[in-house]
């Protein structure tokens, strides 16, 4: 984009954000720095990104008619999906009518469920993945697990933040894992993917940004998951030059196939020099929150530049850094946080409290960030900061 207008004027450059969580909040802040007018949308009021946007709307984004009506009302220059649960077929239609979807409507459509992206990666692009089968019924699922062998992993084809995912160690876990997958799917009961288990050394997120005709990679991010949901991440993840080159080859291949411009979070399994493709998100990734302290341009700043067609001449990484999630459990519409002075007492630490309006059960409400002389000490420092925060329900 060669020109950015004045927000809230007829010549404003408008971005409509579909999904308004903590990642979207940081994207809005970065777009605001460029004087972009931002409209935040989600299925509930007072979502984090809404709190920093120019205005907001509450709709069911899986309702194609409602989504179309809102976009035709706002006439944004850029439509930026922040989550998967969107009527992506409507985005495809809108793109064909002249709207710009970031990174592309094809990317949003293929990655909204695990089947589309897995078939693209494994069957069309020939990328290495775990062996897999899809199942619509318990009988098909049981047959898939028995064919792939134990241990294996089952996931709903549509879910986020690890919801509905299980590692099956034996046939006695089949029923419980099936029930959990049916509860955790974003669209309710339905199709699952069963994957053969890869005995990997570690898993990484390779943040890959397509911008102004180029592809640039951030340093690899290592992360630890529990029940499929990220708990901590660190950068850089140590890996062999062979494994890093293969990771970049896979990431470049899949993001080129998805097309468009923007930041992608490419998830990979690594064992020695071997690399397997796992998943890709065509947007900033939760494990990439570490870049708020580890890089001169965070993943959110990179996404904003790519959206606007601005150059990214270099990405500077500041050395070992880590993030640790602040997880809250309970019921409250007035969550408070105390002991922040203690949490920030050590040098090179930071906090992000997301401002989510309520917690019901378990919810990620913030993240602690730290830099240090090594990845291990940075992880320890970030964890200390996260644990020092007192949550008041």
Swiss-Prot record:
User: Which ranges carry the ATP-grasp domain?
Assistant: 119-308
**For binding ATP, which residues are annotated in this chain's numbering?**
114, 155, 160-165, 195-198, 203
- Enzyme category, top tier: ligase
The protein's annotated pathway:
Purine metabolism; IMP biosynthesis via de novo pathway; N(2)-formyl-N(1)-(5-phospho-D-ribosyl)glycinamide from N(1)-(5-phospho-D-ribosyl)glycinamide (formate route): step 1/1
Keywords from the named record: ATP-binding, Ligase, Magnesium, Metal-binding, Nucleotide-binding, Purine biosynthesis
Record's catalysed reaction(s):
N(1)-(5-phospho-beta-D-ribosyl)glycinamide + formate + ATP = N(2)-formyl-N(1)-(5-phospho-beta-D-ribosyl)glycinamide + ADP + phosphate + H(+)
> Which positions are annotated as binding Mg(2+)?
267, 279
| EC number(s) from the headed UniProt entry | 6.3.1.21
User: What Pfam families does the entry give?
Assistant: ATP-grasp, PurT_C, RS_preATP-grasp-like
GO CC terms on record? cytosol
Q: Does the keyword Nucleotide-binding apply?
A: yes
Q: What are this entry's molecular-function GO terms?
A: ATP binding; magnesium ion binding; phosphoribosylglycinamide formyltransferase 2 activity; phosphoribosylglycinamide formyltransferase activity
Q: Which GO terms describe its biological process?
A: 'de novo' IMP biosynthetic process
Q: Record-annotated residues binding N(1)-(5-phospho-beta-D-ribosyl)glycinamide?
A: 22-23, 82, 286, 356, 363-364
For this protein, the record's InterPro entries field holds: ATP-grasp, ATP-grasp_carboxylate-amine, ATP_grasp_subdomain_1, PreATP-grasp_dom_sf, PurT, PurT/PurK_preATP-grasp, PurT_C
The similarity comment for this entry is: Belongs to the PurK/PurT family.
PANTHER family named among the record's database cross-references: FORMATE-DEPENDENT PHOSPHORIBOSYLGLYCINAMIDE FORMYLTRANSFERASE
Known HAMAP family for this protein? PurT
Give the protein's function: Involved in the de novo purine biosynthesis. Catalyzes the transfer of formate to 5-phospho-ribosyl-glycinamide (GAR), producing 5-phospho-ribosyl-N-formylglycinamide (FGAR). Formate is provided by PurU via hydrolysis of 10-formyl-tetrahydrofolate.
Tell me how this protein assembles.
Answer: Homodimer.
**NCBIfam families per UniProt:** PRK09288.1, purT
Give the protein's recorded name: Formate-dependent phosphoribosylglycinamide formyltransferase
Gene of origin?
purT
């Amino acid at each position: 984009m060669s020109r950015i207008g004045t927000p809230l004027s007829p010549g404003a450059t408008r971005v409509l954000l579909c999904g308004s969580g903590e990642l979207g909040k940081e994207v809005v802040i970065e777009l605001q720095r460029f004087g972009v007018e931002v409209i935040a949308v989600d299925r509930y009021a007072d979502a984090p990104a809404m709190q920093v946007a120019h205005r907001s709307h509450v709709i069911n984004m899986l309702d194609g008619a409602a989504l179309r009506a809102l976009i035709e009302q706002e006439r944004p220059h850029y439509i930026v999906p922040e989550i998967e649960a969107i009527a992506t077929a409507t985005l495809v239609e809108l793109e064909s009518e002249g709207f710009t979807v970031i990174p592309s409507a094809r990317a949003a459509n293929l990655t909204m469920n695990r089947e589309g992206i897995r078939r693209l990666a494994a069957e069309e692009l020939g990328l290495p993945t775990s062996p897999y089968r899809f199942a619509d019924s318990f009988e098909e699922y049981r047959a898939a697990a028995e064919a792939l062998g134990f241990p294996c992993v089952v996931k709903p084809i549509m879910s986020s933040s690890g919801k509905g995912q299980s590692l099956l160690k034996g046939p006695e876990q089949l029923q419980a894992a099936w029930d959990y997958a049916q509860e955790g799917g974003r669209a309710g009961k339905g199709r699952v993917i069963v994957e053969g288990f890869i005995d990997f050394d570690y898993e990484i997120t390779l943040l890959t940004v397509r911008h102004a005709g180029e592809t640039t990679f951030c340093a690899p991010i290592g992360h630890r998951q529990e029940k499929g949901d990220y708990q901590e991440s660190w950068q850089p993840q140590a890996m062999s030059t062979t494994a890093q080159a293969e990771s970049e080859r896979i990431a470049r291949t899949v993001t080129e196939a998805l097309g468009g411009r923007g930041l992608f979070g490419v998830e990979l399994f690594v064992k020695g020099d071997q690399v397997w493709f796992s998943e890709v998100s065509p947007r900033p990734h939760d494990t990439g929150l570490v870049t708020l302290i580890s890089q001169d341009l965070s993943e959110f700043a990179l996404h904003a530049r790519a959206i606007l067609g601005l150059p990214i001449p270099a990405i500077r990484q500041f050395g070992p850094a880590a993030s640790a999630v602040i997880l809250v459990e309970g019921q409250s519409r007035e969550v408070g946080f105390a002991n922040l002075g203690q949490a920030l007492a050590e040098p090179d630490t930071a906090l992000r409290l997301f401002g989510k309006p309520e917690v019901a059960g378990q919810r990620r409400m913030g993240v602690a960030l730290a830099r240090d002389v090594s990845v291990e000490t940075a992880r320890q420092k970030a964890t200390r900061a996260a644990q020092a925060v007192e949550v008041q329900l």
